[in-house]
Amino acid sequence: MATGMGQSLVFAILAPLGREVALGELQITSIIAISALVFALASPHWGRLSDRVGRKPIIITGLLGYTVGTLVFTSVFSIGLAGVLSGTLLYAAALLARCGQSVVMSATNPSTTAYAADNSAAEHRTRTMARLGTANSMGTILGPAVSGALATFGLLAPLYFAATLAASAALLVWRQLPKTPRRERVPRHLRIRLRFTDRRVRHLLATAVGLFVGFSGIQQTLGFTLQDKLELNGIQTAQMTGAALMVSALFTFLVQITVMQRLKLEPGQFIRLGLLAMLFGATILASADHFPLLAVGMGFLGTGLGLTMPSISAGASLAVSADEQGSVAGLVAACPAIGFVAGPLCAGALYQVHPSLAPLFSASVFFLVLVLLVLRERR
């Protein structure tokens, strides 16, 4: 919940904040894209480490890394707003700070997912992952609301709040979360190392990557779309972007506490339904010229995200052994980050050509992934 709220705070204010310090659209989106690549590379290593040393210390490490990284990232923009840093030097400093943060904060997601898998029976795995997703969704709902309120005190206020929240979560985990036992150390040459090409999970991992290529493309150009179409200033853009993200997160939350807890479908069925909802949402966003219609599109996106990601996590967890839970959780956690590498860059470049091309790009990605999954099921 803490990381979900923190990330939604960043996404809500980064576009207007970047424009305040005269960074271009491609520079702003590339900060997310390149740091996401770092996140993707680091996540599997943290997942495997949690298999050996236990989940709790890795979760705490990730939360503390998020705290320190956010403070450094915020300080860079504070210096930029003061006029001390500008241009390429400011961009490089912000990129370095975000990448450093990504190396350590990537520890939290795989270790948390593996902890949930360790403590749930196979027949309840999809529901358990949905509950974990619900906690993240609650943070994502609250984040934009908090961001909009705090933005009245300045664009940096939400980031300081995110750092405080992550530090509080680390303290809570340290005090309250039961320890998980260390596993016996296996010699390096005998360790089974899961790869993205593993036949048991590769279709699920590819789906997750495609899903977030499309979603991140929309998310990272949303602030530009609102600011340009509604002619907003920086603070207004942060508030409206936060509201749009809150709509998406609200639908994610609702579908995870209702549909996914009541319907007994296979993970693959949930994934296909979710992709169809996201395709509708992206298509609506491509033609949206006022906020109510845009909110409808974001609602469809949130519904799709709520159906797909817990199902991907559950399907991957069920496909591997107990000794591989941390490893597969690390791979699944890396997939959104990989999507955030390509999505913002492609959508940011297309947005500069025409604003509608960004959501159309995302719709095309959702359609392609859906078609490939349907064809795979028919084989």
Region roles according to the model:
Residues 12-27, 221-239:
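Short amphipathic helix-loop junctions that connect adjacent transmembrane helices
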Residues 37-41, 240-263:
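Transmembrane alpha-helices of Major Facilitator/SLC transporters
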Residues 42-55, 254-267, 351:
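Helix-to-loop junctions at the C-terminal end of transmembrane segments
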Residues 64-87, 277-289:
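C-terminal ends and interior cores of transmembrane alpha-helices
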Residues 82-107, 293-307:
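Hydrophobic core of transmembrane alpha-helices in multi-pass small-molecule transporters
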Residues 97-136:
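Cytoplasmic helix-loop-helix junction between adjacent transmembrane helices
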Residues 178-206:
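Juxtamembrane intracellular "pre-TM" segments in multi-pass secondary transporters
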Residues 267-312:
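C-terminal transmembrane helical hairpin of 12-TM major facilitator-type secondary transporters
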